[in-house]
Every structure is written in C-alpha cells, then in structure tokens.
Amino acid sequence: MAGAAVHARGLRKAYGQRVAVDGIDLEVRRGECFGFLGPNGAGKTTTMRMLACLSSRDAGELAVLGMDPDSQPRELKARLGVVPQEINLDLELTVLENMLVYARYFGMRRDDARARALELLRFVDLHERADDTVMKLSGGMQRRLQIARALINEPEMILLDEPTTGLDPQARRLVWERLRDLRAGGTSVVITTHYMDEAERLCDRLVVIDHGVVICQGQPAALVRDRVGAEVLEMRAAPDQAAVLAAAASPRNLVEGDVVMAFGDSAHDMRVRADAAGIAWDLVAERRATLEDLFIVLTGHSLRESSAGGD
C-alpha cells in the first residue's frame, strides 16, 4: 500500500530451530494507532525489533516509512521513536540530563535540544521533576520519561513494546492519554500489548498474533462483532453435560471443566436455548464480548493461559 507507515509481506524470523515470526503480512497506515495483541511469546516483540532496526529479518518484505530497516537503518532511526519494554534510562542522571544525552545521538544543537526537552517534559507532566534523578521517579513516571525521550527527534512514528506493563491503573491511564495526544497530532503509533482494555481503548486497528502467526486483523470492535458476537453467557454445569449444554446454547463456545462459555449476539437467546436443552445449569456471568473472547474463539485458550514464556 503506497504511503503506508509499515508494509510487511511474508515476514519471518527464527532463532535456531524456534520460529518466532512465521510469515506475517500487515499494513500500518500513517497517523493511526496500530496494535499487536497476543500473549507473551507470540512474536510481538520480535516483530517490533525488526521494525526498529534492532533485528534483521530472515525472509519476506519489510518497509518502514518507505525504507528497508536492514539496508537503511541510520536513515530510518532518525525518523523513529522507540520505547522498549524494559526501563533503559540512566538512573543516576537527572530527568533533563537523560533527555539531553539522548538528543546528542541525533546531532541536535544544545539550545534546541534543551528547548525540545523541556517542551516534552511538560507534555508528559514531568517538567517539575526535571532536576530530580531518575531513580527518584515512580515506575509510571519513568515510563512517561521514556516516551518523552523517544520523541526528542520529532519522529514520524513511535514504537512502544508493552508500554504499560507493571504500571498501576492511574499510571496506565496517563500513558494512554499521552499516546492518544500523539495520534491526534499525526504521529503514527504502534504498540504491542497483552492487555485487552489497552488495545480496545487505543488501537484504530490491530492484529491478533499467536505462535508467530497473525490469526486476524482489523478494527477491534468489528473483529469482536464479526467473530464472536455482542454478548457472552458463562454457565456452570456437570462436567459430563457441559459440552451438550454448550452446543445447545451456541455453535461458538468453549468448555473448561464444568464451565461453559457461549458466544453470540444475544445472551437472552442463548439462555433460552440452554434451558431448552433440559440440563441443569447455574449462571456465572452475562456480559459484553471483548477482545479476550475473540482470542478464545480463535485459539481455544485465553491470553492469560498463553502468557508464560518470553517473546
């Protein structure tokens, strides 16, 4: 697609015998927030490393901002902002010093770098902590400083790997707010996440990835509506009757021991069909369908169950 922020076809990366990314196709449009949703070990971080010129691909096509990360890393890095999952700040330097040191990598004049740094610290609500050492900041503040630092070169696109992992709810919301501000200003934003609420709140479009393969992509709400339905009915029944109850309630279902999850457009209709099956059951929950349910329908297991291991 002409003018895409990211264009990938058949993208593949392996580490020895382990295939981390297995021939994925994707397009990221300029100015959108695009997400990679999946469990730990799905291939999200490996894909981001290829986009960020930190790891070469084994096969396939990849263009980021119209450039090949493998053959044009210097030019591309000048136009990218990258926020890794781990905190990689200089803890003994002040907040402002961290910004100024990073600006040197882009050849910025000191006066320009200082002005830009102070502007960004205000953007992430850290201007009053400019002279504090980083070790005095909370985890959420350190994450916001990482975002500010990644913006020092006024990038066209920013890549964030699990940007809110380990943060408390208030800190997560502050990060989300700043990412929405960036998107509103025209910056392309690409994130990886295993948090369903984060993907639903931030992403214009996303891919669901598992075991290095893209299993679906599109707008979050549309994916849930088309693949899952509007509502979920969770029931409990005798283990030897749970499968029969599930099939009666909806053709889209999951059985885990004595717990049945039925997916469809109407929880009321699913309850009627469950009652008609003549099997005793208890209601566990009746709720709106989410991206977690989408993942369950597509893979047969939850994101939480899949989250052991690295990426």
For each predicted feature, which ranges?
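Conserved catalytic motifs of ABC-family nucleotide-binding domains
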Residues: 154
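ABC transporter nucleotide-binding domain
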Residues: 176-265
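Conserved ABC ATPase signature
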Residues: 133-137
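Conserved ABC ATPase "signature" region
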Residues: 100, 104, 111-129
